[in-house]
């Protein structure tokens, strides 16, 4: 019987969801702590059978979003997200609302961390091809996905499955460059998965 894998609601460039059936069977049968060293959209780490999972990524907004998913129930995430979408008048065609929210996210000094995280994910859902992209100054710069990207029932189902699974695993979030990760604490049955960005390509995550 084929394994049914959970799909991340984050369309991170280089995500491995479509080839999980080729990757995960190569992992050890027993893993105490699984380290997803370049966590990204977390398609691999969320689907690994391990006692503990460490999500590591150098992009802080991603780490904060993954942590938010882990700390909230799926109902809370969905309800808060839908309220935020409505508050910001986002839809498939409202370019002005998207640009206004993107400008707010890039320049507003947030006093409420949850508001910042929800704004970030709301932007992703209405960005071109749901892509996550920052410039060298860490300003979010993905364009509007007019008539292409939006929050919909499929997205809602993905969020629910993903967050429900996250709530069931023992997860730790790490915000380190891979060279700064403390490998000295790893033990015999721990496993590190490395899928680094493709620095010699023109992928959007290299902008």
Mark where each language-model region is.
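Short, surface-exposed loop/helix-turn segments at secondary-structure junctions
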Residues: 205-207
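Short active-site oxyanion
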Residues: 30-33, 51-52, 168-171
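S-adenosyl-L-methionine
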Residues: 1-39, 43-44, 48
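Short alpha-helix immediately C-terminal to the canonical SAM-binding loop
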Residues: 63
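Conserved SAM-binding loop
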Residues: 66-67
């Amino acid at each position: 019987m084929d394994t049914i894998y959970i799909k991340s609601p984050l369309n991170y460039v280089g995500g491995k969801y479509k080839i999980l059936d080729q990757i995960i069977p190569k992992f050890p049968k027993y893993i105490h702590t699984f380290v997803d060293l370049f966590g990204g959209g977390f398609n691999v780490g969320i689907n690994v059978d391990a006692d503990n999972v460490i999500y590591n990524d150098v992009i802080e907004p991603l780490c904060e979003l993954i942590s938010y998913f882990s700390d909230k129930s799926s109902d809370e995430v969905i309800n808060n997200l839908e309220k935020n979408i409505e508050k910001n008048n986002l839809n498939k065609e409202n370019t002005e609302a998207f640009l206004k929210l993107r400008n707010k996210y890039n320049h507003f000094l947030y006093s409420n961390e949850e508001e910042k995280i929800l704004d970030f994910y709301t932007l992703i859902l209405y960005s071109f091809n749901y892509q996550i992209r920052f410039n060298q100054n860490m300003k979010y710069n993905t364009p509007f996905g007019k008539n292409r990207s939006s929050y919909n029932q499929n997205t809602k189902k993905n969020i629910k499955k993903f967050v429900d699974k996250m709530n069931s695993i023992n997860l730790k979030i790490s915000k380190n460059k891979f060279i700064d990760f403390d490998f000295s604490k790893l033990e015999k049955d721990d496993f590190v998965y490395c899928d680094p960005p493709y620095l010699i390509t023109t992928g959007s995550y290299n902008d």
